[in-house]
């Protein structure tokens, strides 16, 4: 990595039992904290000092008492650890039979022992230097009080790393660089004299910035740091760590804290650099939380997002975020505890319950008049004056799990409306063209990626994208898009209501805009309890999956740009009183419909649906590098299409254009801007 906090004194221990101790560390970590080490050995230099080795031994021990092992709900009192040779890269096949060592939960009084090899996988270029990166991450998820202690040793024999009491002396050729959480999340820009693009990340419930969002941060920096100066976005990634352990305080409170943090961070950075652009990335509850932060800023500092004098909004990205709440998707036995405060104010917010006598700071502008029904925090978020800010983002993107996410199901993560009809017809075309070349992703006709590439058309002349050739896993994934012999209409009514209109269509008939009478199998709904338990029980990627990208079957199955004119007419508006009395969920559905339409009636959204293995809610952000690697496809897509070289080239071109006062452009103009210049890998390969 290009930055380091400390270059530790290199040392050598001569041990009476035989062997040489090269590293002996002892540290403590709280919730949301980690240490990253880069251990390097110059083989030629240490050979001159009598150390001729082809491998070394690493030992990490959780020094906490074994009595803490059963206390999982208040902990867990464990560490996640991985050891990556210098040449390991998720994008490339890792050669040979060497394993990538990691442990998902190093429990109290347990030891993690690894034999690290000085070979081509760890060799730095053509030099005699060999290097490894070691991440040691606290797994604490709830309480902020404990500090977990670990010991970390590297030596030339197993005995010396197990127990060593010898004499140290300095040695050349061995180095250990160390980064703590604060330093990793406070890296400076590559070009201090150039304008800075600030990326703000926001975590979800029982989560944290320092550890859980680290993989996405790493990937954004790995993508942008090597870019040529002419197009380099000069990224700085930051995240507010003050909400750790406070998930129940409510969306308003959490968002206000993030909003204040953003203002303070920008003001602080502007003393050294010039913050020119800003992007937001939120996971799970982080989506509504960052939305509240944007609202707070738009009210407290109306000029903050000014296109000329302020910071330009670029990306607004959410991954598995409950925009319209979860009350319609959670079973009754879980909804009641949320109403009663099982997750504090946050649970009530997500269950669309109003809590009086709470702060209204940053919710309303003094000169605004709001509808009487706008009392739910999730409904207030996209309203004026924040709406103008959300509309001004260059890109607004939603990532949602199609299946296996009972925490934030597809319906709320995708803002209610999807083009089910297009997905169904694409599947039919895929079956007819089994022998045609296929792409690695599904790309819809309206995807920002599809410009400049041809794609097949259906019988109505509407362009559709392609889905990859079928495999057993993909068949299970997409079985819900296939025509079925028998299915009851009542089971798919909510999908009919969520079906978007075709572009330039005047149809307002629900049945007509859905599947033209064809039978439809909706996606299987995940069980909320099982989804929560999957954090503990979900399968972990094997070594073949970790080392070989070709075997990974998790994929993007839908990627489309949704325009406001595609929204169907509101279903729950002006309904007869009798229906309001008959249907128990009428009120909830009406509120959720209002929220979804408020977000989409004036804004274009890119909706990306991914199919990844359980536990998909954590996998979608790769919460832990190897445990949650199934979500690699989502993170890769997000980074490539929002921070990739082509996108950065466009931003660089925009920055070089004359900066005149912006006129009042239409939403259609903003939508066209969103489409410009993005080409997906799937579209490039389409035939």
From Swiss-Prot:
Active site: 284 (charge relay system)
EC category: hydrolase
Keyword Lipid metabolism: yes
Record-linked Gene3D superfamilies: alpha/beta hydrolase
GO terms of biological process kind: lipid catabolic process; lipid metabolic process
Entry GO CC: cytoplasm
Annotated segments matching region Disordered: 429-472, 491-513, 650-687
InterPro entries: AB_hydrolase_fold, DUF676_lipase-like, Lipase-like, Rog1_fam
Stretches with biased composition (Low complexity): 436-463
Record carries keyword Hydrolase: yes
Main localization category: cytoplasm
UniProt keyword annotations, A-Z: Cytoplasm, Hydrolase, Lipid degradation, Lipid metabolism
Residue ranges, compositional bias (Basic and acidic residues): 670-681
Documented EC number(s): 3.1.-.-
Similarity comment: Belongs to the putative lipase ROG1 family.
Protein name: Putative lipase YDR444W
Organismal lineage: Eukaryota, Fungi, Dikarya, Ascomycota, Saccharomycotina
